[in-house]
Amino acid sequence: MVETSHALPLVDVVLLFAYKRTGKTRVSMAFKDYSRAKKGGAADTLYFNAFTEDLFTWDNDLEGDSDRYLSLNTNSRFFNGLKDLVLDEAIARYLHRYADFEFDIDYVDWKITFHKRKAGARNIKISRGEQSLFVWCLFLAICERMLDGHESYQWAKFLYLDDPISSLDDNNAIAVACDLVQLVRRAPSRKDQDGADAPVKVVLSSHHALFFNVVCNEVGRGKDGPKLAHKRYFLQRPDENGKFDLQPTEETPFFHHVALLAELHRAAEPTGRLFTFHFNALRSIMEK
């Protein structure tokens, strides 16, 4: 974690690849604690991780089965200035790229209702995958305002994205990756309200190999915007002392299948442990 923090002043973006159950969320929380300790306890990082989606909870109207909505936990700083930011249009612009449902945000009761674009059904319960997409689109809209230098997010000096997509098909994974990089390109040139330089440093971690590869390729391209200075790492499982190992990958092609084989080898050892994702990894390798 300290290595990642030390790398950030030298680059615009740090990219971490790690398998499921490696501890990516723990690493993001360690980053938060380390950063806050350096700032005397003041928050300076805008996060997207497992805790972000927990800020949204369903009321399924079990009695009437008709008034279903998603509640927002407005105690979180994540929603600072949400009402004044007028995000509906920006959220819809992203959401229409990935899904076919509409939404309405009630800023009085802080709840969100959904309906189908074509069928017209109201107050529908969307799937978990659709909910993840909506939360992600809301987050992108907030990031836009943050990078615009809006006063509600002037406190954010870092942007930490932990597994922004967990279960998307390949087409959406590619689209989300490209949209994200287009937004991140603005981070180094952010200005504050007085016009002074206020760059944002970005950390992205993911277990999704295709998504990670697309992001790596896009941040290194200068065709559609400025090339971003970045470092790439493979985050390995913590050892018996709980210490994580970061393997740099800038000098060689991204070694997804080699790393999978190494992980399977460790799991097969007498001291290793097998989890569901190991079987999925084996199937992935056998299908290649």
Give the positions of each predicted feature:
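Extended helical coiled-coil dimerization/tether regions that scaffold
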Residues: 61, 65-128, 141, 145-158
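Switch/communication elements of ASCE P-loop NTPase nucleotide-binding domains
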Residues: 1-13, 19-27, 32-33, 124-243
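Short, solvent-exposed segments of well-ordered alpha helices
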Residues: 167, 171, 196-199, 248-251, ...
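N-terminal nucleotide-handling cores and adjacent loading/scaffold lobes of large enzymes
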Residues: 1-11, 36-50, 105
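Short, hydrophobic/amphipathic alpha-helical patches that form generic packing surfaces
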Residues: 138-141, 262-263, 284-288
